[in-house]
Design a protein with these regions (language model features):
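Catalytic cores of the polymerase beta-like nucleotidyltransferase superfamily
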Residues: 1-532
Length: 532
């Protein structure tokens, strides 16, 4: 059971999480007032936004320090465009508010939101933290004057570097990301190596592709147990190896992850699933015990015989299937990979005599319960559950067009392509070709029916509930819904029936056959069930 909701962490800053998110700030008068920090020489590409340099210039002009910190420094050195730009300074929040009229400070962690143009940047005062009695957030935050103290509280060495913003940095962010960290560092072309403040050896670890906790890993993970999930996530997203002492500390304290809120677990899981090869992180989570802490139903897959790829169990199949599922587009949730992760979650509970009877229905129930526990968005819970529920369809080339339309109606027109992609990934995860049992033929036939714009749900009928209520003089209620469902089934079988007058005639006939009379009583409730 996860604990109550709490603010989700920033993705890659590396600081103690969670921080209370700063509110959107009103625009600060930065166009003329700030003294911009030093920029790149002519002809060099400057990856640092002008707004960041403007903020840094104002801070430096006022006698304060200004550094980029956390994940943005790591990504700059990798030759990757940072998603977020986080600054750290010795200026106190009240000093920041005085320097930047319109800035907002609505948390206790020293983070001030400063808006420059259309962008809002987070600027945080140097700090060191007190004890972490709940393994999630510091009991007290003390503002400091030393950058090293601020970096010492961060999670991993690659996230514990700082860049003096006034220095020149040239990075080609239009080029393809380097395959390995060493090449990325070469291409980053930091003009002055001294501009990178690196007290914990993060740059060397970045070059070697190593994920290492700052200081004692046991202390870091007991401060904030989310850092263990971040470790396996970074292993997948960055392709890094977790340093042995860091990995061992995760194995010792993996059970602490049970206390994490659902939102924090979900945020890390979704980011991991969007990685190039998610199984890297998933397998680490299983091996260290993290998976058992956050998703015991998935952890139970290990050791369950699968009988598909020799020598592999059900968990191996799940990992293969996740890797085979299409990677999501930027800013899109990894729906398909989440469904791939959960598609066989019902198998351990249904395993008997070498079979998994009804595992799709059981899996759908477990999926809905787990994603609800994680406080996933309703659409993501519903869409993932639907894919898990319907992933065991059995197509045959003898299906009529009406059978194809009925299949689309049952699964949902908007879900069909995802469902077929999930089946293709499931096939690959089983050591087979994606197009087993005529999957591409079914995809083509589904596309034909969708392109024909035939009615596949109630919104496609030529009449609606109001039309039926007026024509038959019946009230709204379950019987009306059943009647509309029966009309839709008839149209699915014969699209030519989708005509207003025909449907109203059919509605009267169906109501009469059920013994219904017009008036308040309406059609009887024994309107039948949808044909299979």
């Amino acid at each position: 059971m996860t604990s109550p909701p709490e603010p989700a962490p920033a993705p890659d800053g590396g600081a103690t999480e969670p921080t209370e998110p700063a509110a959107e700030a009103a625009p600060a008068p930065t166009a003329a007032d700030p003294a911009p920090a030093a920029g790149p020489t002519p002809g060099r590409h400057d990856p640092i936004p002008a707004g960041v340099r403007a903020i840094a210039g104002t801070l430096r002009k006022a006698g304060h320090e200004a550094y980029l910190v956390g994940g943005c420094v790591r990504d700059l050195l990798r030759g990757v465009k940072p998603a977020d730009w986080d600054l750290a300074t010795d200026a106190r929040p009240e000093q920041l508010l005085a320097l930047f009229p319109g800035a907002l400070y609505e948390n206790r962690f020293g983070t001030v939101a400063i808006q420059v143009g259309d962008e809002t940047y987070q600027v945080t005062t140097y700090r060191h933290d007190g004890a972490y009695s709940d393994h999630r957030r510091p009991d007290a935050v003390v503002f400091g004057d030393r950058l090293d103290d601020d970096l010492a509280r961060r999670d991993f060495t690659v996230n514990a570097m700082a860049l003096a913003i006034g220095e020149e940095v040239g990075v080609d962010l239009d080029a393809e990301p380097a395959v390995d960290s060493a090449r990325a560092l070469d291409r980053a072309d930091v003009a002055d190596p001294a501009a990178i403040h690196d007290p914990f050896g993060g740059r060397a670890d970045l070059a070697a592709g190593i994920l290492r906790a700052v200081g004692d890993p046991a202390i870091r993970f007991r401060e904030d147990s989310l850092r263990m999930l971040r470790a396996v996530r970074f292993a997948a997203t960055l392709g890094f190896a977790v340093e042995p002492r860091t990995l061992a500390a995760i194995e010792v304290d993996a059970s602490l992850a049970r206390s994490l809120s659902g939102e924090r677990v979900l945020a890390e899981l979704l980011t991991l699933l969007a990685a190039p090869v998610p199984s890297v992180g998933l397998r680490l989570a299983q091996e260290t015990g993290l998976l058992a802490a956050i998703a015991p139903e998935l952890a139970r897959q290990q050791g369950v015989p699968q009988g598909k790829v020799p020598g592999e169990d059900l968990w191996d199949h799940t990992c293969r299937t996740v890797d085979a599922a299409p990677r999501p587009a930027p800013d899109e949730p990894p729906l398909l990979r989440l469904a791939a992760l959960l598609h066989d979650v019902g198998k351990p509970a249904t395993f008997a005599d070498g079979h998994f009877v009804g595992h799709d229905a059981v899996g759908a129930s477990l999926t809905e319960a787990w994603l609800t526990q994680l406080h996933a968005p309703r659409f993501l819970t519903a869409d993932t559950t639907n894919l898990v529920r319907h992933h065991m369809f059995a197509y045959d080339a003898s299906w009529t067009d009406a059978a194809v339309r009925r299949f689309i109606r049952r699964c949902g027109a908007s879900a069909i392509q995802d469902l077929l992609d999930l089946r293709a990934a499931d096939n690959v995860g089983s050591g087979l070709s994606p197009d087993v049992d005529g999957l591409e033929s079914l995809r083509s036939r589904c596309r034909e029916q969708l392109d024909a714009r035939v009615a596949l749900d109630l919104s496609g009928l030529a009449i609606n509930g109001d039309d039926v209520m007026k024509a038959l003089e019946i009230p709204a209620g379950p019987a009306l819904g059943q009647l509309l469902d029966r009309l839709l089934e008839m149209v699915v079988v014969d699209p030519m029936l989708n005509d207003r007058s025909r449907l109203l005639t059919l509605a009267r006939d169906l109501a009469a056959a059920d013994g219904a009379t017009t008036g308040p009583a309406g059609p009887s409730s024994n309107a039948g069930t949808e044909p299979t």
